[in-house]
């Protein structure tokens, strides 16, 4: 793919194109050019070499070449990175949750909290589907499928950006501070410290004397991994080397075990959280004061211990020195420096400014879409976050826009030029992309349903052409037509389904479908197709091959009045052969004559009936019978029909032979009547 100087659109180069690169002028000189046909809604089509219009006086077209008989399939790349099963899983969740909508009540803090948690639960459900796919992709890569790596990397960024948005705008838990969600995001984004490093340090003769012991412990504190911090302190060997520190270490372990940020289930209210956190911070400050008074401890050990306490106390300068990037510093500030001032996106934006300001040593790389999304989310700029999410992945953008809009964080931008909201625009584009590149029409339509007018029109235009591979697909399409009151489109769906059934030789079901669709012209066409099949095979339809068709042709009560009327020619010829097979010639003759005398019987098929009549009259059993199997009335009816159609019958020899046999029948009847 490349950009074009002439139009502001991407240009795709087809592989194995009909005309080789550099040969276009040669073909043009022969009066040819390349042409293509696009699928009604898929991003694919066929290319071929075609005659173009030219002036015959100045240019002559060369003779046809074999390459012109070939067609070449092409498709444009999909802009979606998600595998189909993830798109389907999202679609199922989307349909379940779209009807559950909560309107923000801005004057009620309790309602806003409930709203945030509600959409946080929904967000985590969608995001959990990505995690399942990531685990599966990683498993496949471990088994040697290295081509999965690009998809894994892209989806990992999508999941991480989604987790960032969830932590700030709709956390499913942590109602008293957003700091824990932000910390979880960073720990998932960049898992630190590495567990194997910790095992190596703890296996050292005296662990705290390992050169990486204190950096490792500090990292566990910065990441809020207090259980690991406690484990390191207990196994450090500090209290053995310095017994005077035992009481201090035990006190620090007790403080870490009861951190209010990591034990929010015990907290009853916001004020209770604030009280517990201030008490926790005061215990740390007091412990630091006690440690500084120690005089009989190695100064280096004492300094390292104080650094750990400074980190836990939220000392910005000390925390920054132990951080590797702005995300880590930002989350540490939220968790250790200001969890009380970390309750909403506005608070988060202030912490972000602190983490990336002039006094910070960290650089924000705005050229990476994933990082720019997180920057916008942390800066309380949801609209800009959606713009960059769109560039990273359309699936991420549409779901974030939906959640941010419904939770009240994203305004509805509507203008005369764009009369739909940003959310609706993204939903329409996402549905279009899913349909064009993956042909997942059920998924596409599930999203389009949520956009009243535009989505309705798109479904109406596309649903008659969707592939109906099984009964479930057909029922889904019909149910959607019923929901949206698309009566004409439902009839087209049934007609399409009938075509699928006919391709599988399920004619009985196809007739029922066409009858339900009220497509009587198609029903009539299929009827005569069955009529021709029956005559060509010279036998009735078998119930073993199509039980429903056999039932429809054998019992008019199984049909609606309209269906029974339209299929009567095919049903009659079926019954004719059935009676012949069961040696009921008189019954068969009644049906055959009925077809011959049928009003508006297609003249193109009349010769076939004459051949059947000729075969019937010249059947050895019929010729040698003492009881003629054609009633006198039917004989006269046949003669009358032959006289009417004489001018249209080309095979006059056949006509003469039938006349002779019918005349013999009349003689036979008069002879037996006189007796």
UniProtKB/Swiss-Prot annotation:
Q: Where in the cell is it found?
A: Cytoplasm; Nucleus envelope; Cytoplasm, Cytoskeleton, Microtubule organizing center, Spindle pole body; Nucleus, Nuclear pore complex
Its protein name is: Nucleoporin nup85
What is the documented function of this protein?
A: Functions as a component of the nuclear pore complex (NPC). NPC components, collectively referred to as nucleoporins (NUPs), can play the role of both NPC structural components and of docking or interaction partners for transiently associated nuclear transport factors. Active directional transport is assured by both, a Phe-Gly (FG) repeat affinity gradient for these transport factors across the NPC and a transport cofactor concentration gradient across the nuclear envelope.
Lineage, opening ranks:
Eukaryota, Fungi, Dikarya, Ascomycota, Taphrinomycotina
- Keywords noted in UniProt: Cytoplasm, Cytoskeleton, mRNA transport, Nuclear pore complex, Nucleus, Protein transport, Translocation, Transport
A GO molecular-function term, please? euchromatin binding
Q: Does the keyword tRNA-binding apply?
A: no
Gene name, Swiss-Prot/TrEMBL: nup85
Cite the record's note on assembly.
Component of the nuclear pore complex (NPC). NPC constitutes the exclusive means of nucleocytoplasmic transport. NPCs allow the passive diffusion of ions and small molecules and the active, nuclear transport receptor-mediated bidirectional transport of macromolecules such as proteins, RNAs, ribonucleoparticles (RNPs), and ribosomal subunits across the nuclear envelope. Due to its 8-fold rotational symmetry, all subunits are present with 8 copies or multiples thereof.
- Can you list the GO cellular component terms from the UniProt entry? cytosol; euchromatin; heterochromatin; nuclear envelope; nuclear periphery; nuclear pore; nuclear pore outer ring; nucleolar peripheral inclusion body
Family to which this protein belongs:
Belongs to the nucleoporin Nup85 family.
Q: Which GO biological-process labels does this protein carry?
A: mRNA export from nucleus; positive regulation of DNA-templated transcription; protein import into nucleus; ribosomal subunit export from nucleus
């Amino acid at each position: 793919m490349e950009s074009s100087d002439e139009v502001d659109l991407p240009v795709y180069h087809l592989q194995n194109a009909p005309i080789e690169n550099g040969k276009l002028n040669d073909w043009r000189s022969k009066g040819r050019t390349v042409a293509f046909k696009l699928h009604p809604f898929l991003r694919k089509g066929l290319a071929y070499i075609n005659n173009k219009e030219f002036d015959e006086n100045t240019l002559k077209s060369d003779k046809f070449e074999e390459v012109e008989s070939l067609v070449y399939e092409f498709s444009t790349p999909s802009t979606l990175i998600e595998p189909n099963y993830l798109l389907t899983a999202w679609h199922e969740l989307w349909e379940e949750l779209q009807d559950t909508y909560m309107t923000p009540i801005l004057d009620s803090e309790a309602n806003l909290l409930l709203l945030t948690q509600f959409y946080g639960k929904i967000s985590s459900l969608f995001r959990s589907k990505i995690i399942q796919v990531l685990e599966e992709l990683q498993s496949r890569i471990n088994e040697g499928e290295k081509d999965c790596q690009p998809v894994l990397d892209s989806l990992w960024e999508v999941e991480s950006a989604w987790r960032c948005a969830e932590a700030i705008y709709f956390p499913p838990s942590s109602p008293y501070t957003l700091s824990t969600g932000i910390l979880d995001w960073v720990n998932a984004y960049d898992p630190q410290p590495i567990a194997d490093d910790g095992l190596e340090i703890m296996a050292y003769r005296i662990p705290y004397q390992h050169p990486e012991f204190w950096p490792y412990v500090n990292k566990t504190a910065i990441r809020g991994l207090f259980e690991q911090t406690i484990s390191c302190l207990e196994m450090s060997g500090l209290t053995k080397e310095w017994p005077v520190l035992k009481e201090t270490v035990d006190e620090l372990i007790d403080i870490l075990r009861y951190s209010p940020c990591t034990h929010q289930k015990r907290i009853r209210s916001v004020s209770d959280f604030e009280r517990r956190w201030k008490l926790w911070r005061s215990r740390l400050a007091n412990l630091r004061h006690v440690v500084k008074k120690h005089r009989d401890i190695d100064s280096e050990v004492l300094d390292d211990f104080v650094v750990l306490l400074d980190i836990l106390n939220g000392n910005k300068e000390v925390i920054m020195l132990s951080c590797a990037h702005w995300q880590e510093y930002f989350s540490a500030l939220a968790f250790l420096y200001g969890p009380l001032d970390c309750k909403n996106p506005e608070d988060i934006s202030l912490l972000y400014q602190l983490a990336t300001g002039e006094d910070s040593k960290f650089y924000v790389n705005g050229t990476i879409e994933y990082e720019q999304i997180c920057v916008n989310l942390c800066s309380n700029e949801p609209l800009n976050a959606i713009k960059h999410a769109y560039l990273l992945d359309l699936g991420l953008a549409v779901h974030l826009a939906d959640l941010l809009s419904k939770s009240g964080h994203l305004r509805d931008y509507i203008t005369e030029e764009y009369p739909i909201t940003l959310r609706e625009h993204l939903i329409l584009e996402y549905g279009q992309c899913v349909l064009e590149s993956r042909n997942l029409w059920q998924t596409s339509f599930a999203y389009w349903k949520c956009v009243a007018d535009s989505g309705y029109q798109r479904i109406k235009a596309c649903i008659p052409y969707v592939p109906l591979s099984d009964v479930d697909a057909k029922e889904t399409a019909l149910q959607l037509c019923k929901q949206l009151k698309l009566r004409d489109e439902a009839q087209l769906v049934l007609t399409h389904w009938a075509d699928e059934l006919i391709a599988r030789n399920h004619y009985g079901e196809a007739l029922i479908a066409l009858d339900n669709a009220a497509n009587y012209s198609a029903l009539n066409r299929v009827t005569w197709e069955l009529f021709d099949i029956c005559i060509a095979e010279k036998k009735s339809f078998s119930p073993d091959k199509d039980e429903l068709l056999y039932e429809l042709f054998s019992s008019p009560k199984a049909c609606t009045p309209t269906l029974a009327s339209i299929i009567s020619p095919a049903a009659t010829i079926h019954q004719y052969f059935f009676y012949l097979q069961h040696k009921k010639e008189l019954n068969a003759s009644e049906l055959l004559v009925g077809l011959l005398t049928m009003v508006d019987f297609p003249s193109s098929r009349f010769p076939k009936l004459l051949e059947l009549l000729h075969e019937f009259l010249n059947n050895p059993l019929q010729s040698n019978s003492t009881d003629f199997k054609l009633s006198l009335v039917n004989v006269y009816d046949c003669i009358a029909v032959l006289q009417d159609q004489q001018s249209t019958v080309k095979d006059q020899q056949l006509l003469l032979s039938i006349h002779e046999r019918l005349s013999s029948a009349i003689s036979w009847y008069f002879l037996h009547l006189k007796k």
